[in-house]
Amino acid sequence: MGLTVACLRIVVLVSTLALGAPSQAQSPPSTQASDPRAMGWMQGFPPPADKTIRFTDPDYFSFPKLRWTVCHFRELMPTAGVDRGPGAASALPQAPEPGIDALRFTPLGGQASMSWGEAFDANHTDGLLVLHHGRVVYERYAGCLGPHTLHGAMSLTKSITGLLGEVLVAEGALDENARVGTLIPQLQDSAFGDASVRQVLDMTTTLQFSEDYADPNAEVWQHAQAGSTLPPPAGYTGPRSYYESLQQIRKGGEHGQVFGYKTPNADALGWLLARTTGKPLNELLAERIWRRIGAEREAFYTVDAIGTPFAGGGFNVTLRDLARLGQLILQQGEWQGVQLLPSAAIERIQRGGERAPFARAGYAQLPGWSYRAMWWHSGDAHGAFSARGVHGQTLWIDPVADVVIARLASHPVAANAANDPTSLPAWRAVTKHLMAQDQTPLLGGQWVIEDVAGAGVIDRTRAFLRFLADGRLVGHATCNGLRGHHTSGARGRLRLRLTGITRKRCAPALMHQEERLLALLPRVTRYRIDDSGALWLYTAAGKTLTARR
């Protein structure tokens, strides 16, 4: 399958299409043959000369060396840690689902089916973990990766940067309508000077910046050398940091008209986050998320010569911790009963962006998709959205199925278009399977309330319920958040117990709706899910509540 220019843009700065990666006319070594251990990379004291990998090698990030490098960035370049704090790692309950490797699906554009296990190998997967209702139903490793190994996340990093950006917007610390040049005077004369924060977040800026890795004169090479992700050539006199590189990028047209996937947007956003909070990106992520979700290991960012974290592609993480991050987002920023991130930030990401600017960008394999806050939204019936990085890095979140899929990989080709045909249908196949096998249909996603005791609901009031696997009930009662517990049994029996609610006043009509809802919930005795997927809650007196995911 040929790569279009649009597809080539879906790459991280350390891509290798111009550095000796195999052409698509060639058949790269299989995942087994290219395993770092089978190849003998960096084995021995010292390793043989022809098995040594150095940062100064022009092909250190080319396949098949790539398969070793993705787990060893910390040995090759400067980094900054994302502190996990002193606490214990949070539990990931195990509930293995047999038969997932045998699931079959048809790749995009194909005719013959393939199995999930075959796709694992075809995509040169290093690790893949699936959470359903917060429980691990599938976990498998290969290549350089193990349960405690850190792996480069590539452009998946951008989505973490975007998440933190949306958090600051939701909290009022960062004005999404402000001009970047006003917030960062050093960027006033650059392409970003008159761009809004929102345009940077959604990558609807127009930059004179090429990420065509087949072009040796593309601006991406200088940006990579400025950020120290590639060794500069002899006599290099260009920018020496991300900050310097961003100031040299010029405007290519009117902002806000078309989606244009350009890594400098993420680096500009990283600068905005640091300027707003007074903290570098690695410290901000540690403070807001990493120390609070029970991460197993310190994560890290690669950094430039002055210590600036690479906001567009430098994050390194374990597979399990990546899955924990996905579960936090699936749970609307709530973790073990504590709201770590404003739910409004997650909801804005989950809604996706405008489809028209995305459609004009030419992603033929992603019809109906959109992009918001550096997250990719599928536009499908489940509202699935994802963080994506080249060589196969993925964090796929399906709110309806209550599924998180985390994958770290070292695919030979540095473009998502190369693995999407065997990845996107695989994600949908496993979510369909898990939903079909689900013995706890109440769990998963938000049940958005459509009617309370026959009185309907006021439009756009965001009343919803979430039934969590540990027995907790969380939701929004119209004006206020609620929490409690749920217990279900045979023949649709259900008991709900409320244990807390916030006490914010709002308009009388909204308060009246909330009062009706809060009066009904403790009286619920049973439930059913009808053929349309609607949830019905019943009281002994015959009153009902209906909701839909």
Where do the model's predicted regions map?
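Short active-site loop at a secondary-structure junction
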Residues: E118-L129, A142-A173, N177-A191, A195, ...
